């Protein structure tokens, strides 16, 4: 059984569906859900132990406690950070903020987007080399030409001219210059 933690559907759901489809085609049972529901299902034994694939290993008290519950239910934790560190281009800082010794201890495997975050993780956390894998991201896989037809189906064809107003300015209001 594979449990895929989905936090922000607009950001993560397509790539989680890709992972789920590939895993299911190989005979795995896959469930995509929010973390709270998955933990409740595991703790109450409604869900059987398996792999809990989470969207980050950011070290926080809450995350560490949640991971303890997941591990105590019999699951293994794996992760790929959904935020990737690509914008700031300061992978070492990203690795220090988004990972910690305690959360790395709890994880069975950590997947990286590419060589930059992979090398930073290996350099900053050398005791966990055997857990860190350079796999790429399913979000990036969806950019490949083989998925163009997938994106065409979701394209909205406006009937009139329109104005797009973005309501997400995270990178624009970052403390430091990111570009």
Per-region residue spans from a language model:
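Active-site and donor-binding regions of nucleotide-sugar-utilizing enzymes
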Residues: 2-155, 165-174
């Amino acid at each position: 059984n594979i449990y895929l933690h989905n936090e922000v559907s607009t950001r993560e759901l397509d790539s989680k569906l890709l992972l789920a489809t590939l895993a299911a085609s190989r005979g795995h049972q896959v469930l995509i859900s929010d973390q709270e529901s998955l933990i409740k299902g595991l703790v109450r034994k409604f869900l059987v132990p398996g792999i809990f694939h989470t969207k980050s290993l950011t070290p926080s008290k809450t995350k560490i406690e949640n991971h303890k519950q997941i591990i105590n239910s019999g699951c293994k934790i794996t992760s790929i950070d959904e935020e990737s560190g690509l914008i700031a281009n300061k992978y070492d800082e990203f690795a220090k903020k988004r990972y910690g010794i305690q959360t790395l201890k709890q994880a069975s495997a950590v997947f990286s987007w590419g060589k930059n975050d992979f090398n930073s993780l290996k350099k900053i956390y050398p005791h966990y080399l055997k857990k860190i894998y350079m796999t790429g991201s399913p979000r990036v896989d969806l950019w490949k030409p083989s998925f163009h037809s997938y994106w065409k189906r979701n394209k909205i064809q406006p009937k009139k001219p329109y104005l797009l107003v973005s309501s997400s300015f995270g990178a624009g209001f970052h403390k430091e210059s990111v570009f």
